[in-house]
Amino acid sequence: MRLSLVGVAIGLLSSSAIVTAQTYTDCNPLQKTCPPDPALGRSVTYDFTKGSSPDFKPVGSPTYDSNNGAAFSVAKQGDAPLIQSNWYMMFGHVEFVIKTAPGKGIVSSAVLQSDDLDEIDWEWLGANNLYVQTNYFGKGDTGSYNRGAAHDNAGNQDGFHTYTIDWTSTQIVWQIDGKTVRVLTAESAGDHFPQSPMMVKVGVWAGGDPNNAPGTIQWAGGETDYSAGPYTMYLKSLVATDYSTGKSYTYSDKSGSWRSITSDGGQINGNSDAESISTVESAPPVTATIDSAPIPFSGTHRETSSFVTPSIWPWVPKPTTLSSSVAKDTTLPSGWTFSGSRQVQPPSAASSTPPCTSSSLVSSLASPSHSGLKTSSISSVPNSSSATKSTGHLASTATYQISTYDSTLPSFSASIAHVAPTVAAANDLLEAPLGMGVFCALLGGLIAIF
């Protein structure tokens, strides 16, 4: 029975184990001088119903048939077939005609990836026939996980759809059957914007393999039952247009910037007239975004030094630099002083009401619903980079979006530690100002008597 994904708001990409279908690089030009990348430099169409192409290197054992094209099957433990292009494009347009693989724990993917681990992705979970995930990475940086998104894509396992990536120096556009589902601008992505020569990879792997980390297995929808396979993804055709020209692309320095890339016998952006998607003024809303939690490895990142696979799901994020409990005010009330013996001395006039710190924290956690997607907000103390500091008081709160999907998997409540107190803790916070006021009044009275 096909199961919907619980908590698809976990985006994509990364980890440190498992199958050969993951991303790696033979030579990282950010670390050393590497050979030039062979350029596509033109527009090409591949019809895989006619068989394989010498322009693609097979890994594993993809097969071909006249109806569906290239077939990538997981039939037993360790299977992770894919094809990868022998050429690179320096900005460009790719259209994949794909029918994704069903099956709990099975992951289908179509990826653009560079030698320095820039990456643009489509990924489908076999446990979910309703959604597709998109993601991007710059220089293999998996230090934050606010880049993934999920989009409506009902029936992706039942028939072929056209999935497009249009990539320029200013934006990335993801489309399904000609309809734009996401736009990323270079300005908004900053240093994480993919901007170096990319190869194409298409394939399938078992995220639910029992040897994988528990977190990876649960993200993939559960443990893969190989006896119920094989699980097959199909790539009927692929159209690719390189927006640059030449024979090869070379990194002239170790910056990874697109302006540092040179073309042998051509020009970067020399084929920009072939751009098929003009600037998109506004992007449609995505089905779900991932702002706050790390995500499990999804079959396209293997060797990234900054990531360690979590062993459980849901993950617990590290505490922020500010405490999520009530801030402590260590200063004395206005007019109060310490005597030479370090005794508290009230002002000579009427008693002063001490400032009592309070903070209202509200937690509304997302949970699965048979009515579909539910999104909840969690008020949390932000990290120091997003807070306005003030003595003894919390300045603001940050809102994280957690999305869940209708599922027949065992229900759970998404949880984030160091975000919001329990009900009892919240009551304690509300009672704190009253208790502090009573304490200060008693203290002032005792000092006045003695």
From Swiss-Prot:
GO CC term (a single one): plasma membrane
Knockout mutant characteristics: Does not affect growth rate, germination or sporulation and displays only minor sensitivity to high concentrations of Congo Red, even when all crh family members are deleted.
Localization in the cell: Cell membrane; Secreted, Cell wall
Signal peptide: 1-21
Coiled coil (residue ranges): none
Molecular function (Gene Ontology), one example: glycosyltransferase activity
EC number: 3.2.1.14, 2.4.-.-
Keyword hit for rRNA processing: no
Keyword terms: Cell membrane, Cell wall, Cell wall biogenesis/degradation, Disulfide bond, Glycoprotein, Glycosidase, Glycosyltransferase, GPI-anchor, Hydrolase, Lipoprotein, Membrane, Secreted, Signal, Transferase
Alphabetical list of Pfam families matching this protein: Glyco_hydro_16
Gene Ontology biological process terms from the UniProt entry: carbohydrate metabolic process; chitin metabolic process; fungal-type cell wall organization
PTM comment text: The GPI-like anchor contains a phosphoceramide lipid group. The anchor position has not been determined.
InterPro entries assigned to the protein according to its UniProt record, in alphabetical order: ConA-like_dom_sf, GH16, Glyco_hydro_16_CRH1_prd, Glycosyl_Hydrlase_16
Presence of keyword Isomerase: no
Domain GH16: 46-228
Sites carrying sugar chains: 383
Binding site for chitin: 123, 201, 205, 216
Record's function text: Dual chitinase/transglycosylase that plays a role in cell wall architecture. Chitinase and transglycosylase activities are coupled. Required for the polysaccharide cross-linking at the septa and the cell wall. More specifically, transfers chitin to 1,6-beta-glucan in the cell wall.
Family of the protein in this entry: Belongs to the glycosyl hydrolase 16 family. CRH1 subfamily.
Name under which the protein is recorded: Crh-like protein 4
Species of provenance: Aspergillus fumigatus (strain ATCC MYA-4609 / CBS 101355 / FGSC A1100 / Af293)
Taxonomic lineage: Eukaryota, Fungi, Dikarya, Ascomycota, Pezizomycotina
Gene it is expressed from: crh4
